């Protein structure tokens, strides 16, 4: 959460979330310092030197040069209509079908980068130059009006629908794993390279960020007879590793509301599980998958299988 350290405005940014850089702890700007050491939650603004953390003069000079290079890179990519890190070069952007918008403000409130403002009627006003193409707004929208040309609710939904669901008499479970492409998917790749083994009944569906998860995917999967949904996302919390700052945390928050869907379908809550996976946790992937498969074996097949 924002520490709220800055009492006086210095930057006077015109963002819905306020005029300053969001801070995390001790008044320093919020950022994913492991992978993007100069990044802030304001696209095109990079922190350096003692603005970022305490450091000596020599280090400040090197740090300032690094931040300047990132600013040049951002200017060049933005001029070409491309996204900056972590999806550098992506030329897609969120498109809104305003005919179905209910002005719920969830997209404007949940975007970690302030890429969506509001007009006087609470309609979303996207700013593509601020957008990181994470898809968090897409996952937040209950009406599913937000999409990208190469990434949408219907596109992932069709991927899930194409997964073969074994018949009940085959006695083979089917589990879908929604996996973040930033940390969890590379960890899965490394586990595969090292020839590690896990259950063959799991099908992995990569996502830009787990924060782009829309709850309709879980409802549709379970109603089709999928036995379980496993979600693998970045670590969140005070020492978060989410490349899009809040995506993994938001996915976990949304998942806490999925119990209503499970109750409506008369299904067990154990059929849906969220797991935090770091990029170095490749050796834990087989155990994570196999433990979840044991849980699915205990609760039994989905009663909607074969309908």
Annotate each language-model stretch with its function.
Residues 269-307:
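Divalent-metal-activated hydrolytic enzyme cores
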Residues 53-54, 209-214, 277-285:
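A short acidic, often aromatic-flanked loop/helix-cap motif at beta-alpha or helix-coil junctions
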Residues 181-196:
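Redox- and metal-dependent alpha/beta enzyme cores, enriched for Fe-S-associated oxidoreductases
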Residues 212-222:
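Thiamine diphosphate
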Residues 1-174, 185, 198-210, 227-230, ...:
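Residues forming the flavin
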Residues 243-250:
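Alpha-helix N-cap and loop-to-helix initiation/capping positions
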Residues 188-190, 241-243, 285-287:
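A short acidic (Asp/Glu
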């Amino acid at each position: 959460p924002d520490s709220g350290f800055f009492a006086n405005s210095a930057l006077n940014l015109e963002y819905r979330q306020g005029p300053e850089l969001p801070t995390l702890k001790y008044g320093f700007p919020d950022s994913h310092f492991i992978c993007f050491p100069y990044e802030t939650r304001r696209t095109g603004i990079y922190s350096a030197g003692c603005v970022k953390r305490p450091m000596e003069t020599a280090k400040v000079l090197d740090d300032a040069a690094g931040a300047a290079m990132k600013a040049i890179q951002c200017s060049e990519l933005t001029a070409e209509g491309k996204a900056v890190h972590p999806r550098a070069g992506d030329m897609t952007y969120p498109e809104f079908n305003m005919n179905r918008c209910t002005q719920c403000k969830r997209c404007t409130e949940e975007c970690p980068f302030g890429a969506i403002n509001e007009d006087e009627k609470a309609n979303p006003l996207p700013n593509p130059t601020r957008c990181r193409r994470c898809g968090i707004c897409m996952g937040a929208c209950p009406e599913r009006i937000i999409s990208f040309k190469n990434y949408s609710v219907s596109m992932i939904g069709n991927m899930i629908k194409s997964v073969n669901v074994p018949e009940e008499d085959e006695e083979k479970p089917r589990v879908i794993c929604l996996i973040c492409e930033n940390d969890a998917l590379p960890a899965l790749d490394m586990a595969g390279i090292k020839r590690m083994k896990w259950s063959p009944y799991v099908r992995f569906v990569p996502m830009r960020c787990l924060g782009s998860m829309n709850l309709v995917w879980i409802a549709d999967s379970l109603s089709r007879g999928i036995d379980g949904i496993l979600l693998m996302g970045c670590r969140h919390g005070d020492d978060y590793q989410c490349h899009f700052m809040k995506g993994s945390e938001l996915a976990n928050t949304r998942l806490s509301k999925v119990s209503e869907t499970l109750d409506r379908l008369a299904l067990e809550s154990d059929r849906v599980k969220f797991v935090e996976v770091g990029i170095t946790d490749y050796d834990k992937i087989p155990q994570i998958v196999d433990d979840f498969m044991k849980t699915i074996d205990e609760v039994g097949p989905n009663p909607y299988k074969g309908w």
